[in-house]
Amino acid sequence: MKHHKSMRTLGRERNQRRALLKSLSASLIEEKKIKTTLARARELRPVMDKLVTLSKKGNVNAIRLLYAKVGRDNAKKLVGEIAISYKDRNGGYTRIIKLNPRKSDGALMAQIEFV
């Protein structure tokens, strides 16, 4: 039964799901916006909000956690550029825009981007 299971499985096991979200978050940090399925975008949103909140702290421990989550280059970009632009904002750092369904399989698509 699905009692108190807040996360979608995205058709993957736990390690694969973590790797997928790590890859999507790294891509979003690099590109500022990415196009993906709606379910993946909805799962990525809270992950990115937590990463941006963590990067706003800016202390050594937070930066080391960011290194582990998104890699060294992306962590530096997150702390150096993105966190500074959101210093006065308390959450809601990303927006999801629904797009037309994918032609091949009809999957609902969305664009997730920084506000």
What are these regions (language model features)?
Residues 1-12, 19, 23-115:
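Structured, basic alpha/beta domains of bacterial-type, RNA-associated proteins
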